[in-house]
């Protein structure tokens, strides 16, 4: 178990993906300008093949297809452009989905025949840079053909939100701490974690009050755009594809610490008293490192049993954690507290590498060929050699959702 290479990118890394387990890597990062998006093609030794810079929104957006074509979303004039970058760095086809001047792409997913996009109000940075009025359009989800033709568009009504753990204090409460009454969000954005997932004939699109952190997930029919169901307002959390048309929706904060499984009808079929970066294997078993906003840590690696109970794995120190990957033997690998850790099927933990590092911005772990594991820490990419086997096949985040970083289960 060795650190085989490490290399620095122009800015904080937002995404690392590859179309082939042997590389090269396609890295999406910020540039020196926080509104710039930089795309870098680099091999596992750190040798750069090409690099391109795009205007951004403060939220670099990209998705990699199975053939190695990267799609980048960025503002262009008064609209938004989806541009493809071919494996050699040249420009491929583009799509210009119709939108309002004050809208931007909050998240998108590549489909086999087009795109699904979550639209939100343009970021404050972009609106201020362009001297635009601070209008706040309602969010929406839309599906497009490959050329950009809109097939359907569905408005999202987040509505008034509230949660029992949210409190307020002021003149209205006589300066006493009381539960906050339901409120209408002033600004709505896509959720920070896994905001848009597509599985079989269902979409899970998550939107949140950007100031209060209370949000909802909306389940839509992929073919028609019809809203099938929506979760109740709750603190946002990690999410995953749990199977065809099925999703895991987590909630963490204000006293919430749960994960629910939802079927294709949007009905909750299971709920666990745990929240984390969960893996779902080919048999539908769920496990992963817990993520809780507290120190000292009381998190563990947990297995979420079918009867809604928890199976305890090893205790986890520290706080900041990468999303894990899993090999075909069922061993999970992830970065936490300055260590590269594995947890095997017996729930035994093993430390593969450690260094004094407390960086807070950590990308997901990618498991590549010959046991190579890639993790990004802030503006740096680290490549490790490990004894792990090939990447497992399963709904999340194995297979395409792991390597390509495109949350789609066809």
Regions found by a protein language model. Name each.
Residues 296-297, 310-344:
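Loop/turn-rich, solvent-exposed surfaces of beta-rich toroidal or solenoidal domains
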Residues 1-46, 396-397, 401, 407:
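An edge-strand/N-cap motif at the start of beta-rich repeat modules
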Residues 3-9, 47-53, 91-98, 150-154, ...:
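A short beta-strand motif characteristic of beta-propeller blades
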Residues 39-43, 82-89, 133-148, 215-222, ...:
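Beta-propeller blade signature
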Residues 30-31, 120-137, 207-212, 291-295:
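Short, conserved, GDST-rich strand-edge loop motifs in beta-rich repeat architectures
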Residues 10-19, 55-65, 100-112, 159-172, ...:
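Repeated scaffold domains used in trafficking and secretory/extracellular systems
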Residues 360-410:
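Blade-level signature of beta-propeller repeat domains, shared across WD40, Kelch, NHL, RCC1
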Residues 22-23, 67-69, 112-114, 200-202, ...:
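Short coil/turn segments that connect the beta-strands within blades of beta-propeller domains
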């Amino acid at each position: 178990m060795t650190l085989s290479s490490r290399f620095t990118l122009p800015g904080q890394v937002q995404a690392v993906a590859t179309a082939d387990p042997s590389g090269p890597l396609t890295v999406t990062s910020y540039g020196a300008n926080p509104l710039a998006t930089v795309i870098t093609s680099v091999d596992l030794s750190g040798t750069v093949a090409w690099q391109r810079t795009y205007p951004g929104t403060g939220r670099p957006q990209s998705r990699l297809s199975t053939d190695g074509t990267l799609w980048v979303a960025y503002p262009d004039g008064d609209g938004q452009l989806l541009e493809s970058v071919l494996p050699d760095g040249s420009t491929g086809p583009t799509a210009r989905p119709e939108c309002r001047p004050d809208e931007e792409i909050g998240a998108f997913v590549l489909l086999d025949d087009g795109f699904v996009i979550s639209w939100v109000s343009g970021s404050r940075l972009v609106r201020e840079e362009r001297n635009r009025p601070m209008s706040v359009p309602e969010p929406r989800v839309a599906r497009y053909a490959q050329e950009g033709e809109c097939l359907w568009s569905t408005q999202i009504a987040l509505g008034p939100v509230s949660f029992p753990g949210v409190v307020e204090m002021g003149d209205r409460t006589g300066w006493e701490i009381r539960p906050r009454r339901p409120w209408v969000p002033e600004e709505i954005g896509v959720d920070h974690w896994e905001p848009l997932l597509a599985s079989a004939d269902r979409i899970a699109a998550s939107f949140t009050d950007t100031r209060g952190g209370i949000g909802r997930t909306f389940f839509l029919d992929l073919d028609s755009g019809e809203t099938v169901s929506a979760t109740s307002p709750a603190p946002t959390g990690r999410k995953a594809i749990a199977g065809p048309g099925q999703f895991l929706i987590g909630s963490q904060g204000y006293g919430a610490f749960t994960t629910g499984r939802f079927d294709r009808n949007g009905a909750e079929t299971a709920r666990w008293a745990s929240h984390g970066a969960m893996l779902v294997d080919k048999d539908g078993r769920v496990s992963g490192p817990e993520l809780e906003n507290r120190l000292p840590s009381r998190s563990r690696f947990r297995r979420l049993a079918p009867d809604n109970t928890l199976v305890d794995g090893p205790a986890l120190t520290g706080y900041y954690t990468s999303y894990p990957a899993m090999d075909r033997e069922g061993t999970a690998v992830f970065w936490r507290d300055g260590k590269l850790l594995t947890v095997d099927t017996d729930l035994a933990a093993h430390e593969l590498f450690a260094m004094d590092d407390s960086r807070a911005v950590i990308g997901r772990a990618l498991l590549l060929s010959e046991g190579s594991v890639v993790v990004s820490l802030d503006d740096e990419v680290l490549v490790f050699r490990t004894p792990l086997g090939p990447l497992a096949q399963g709904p999340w985040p194995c297979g395409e959702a792991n390597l390509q970083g495109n949350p789609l289960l066809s």
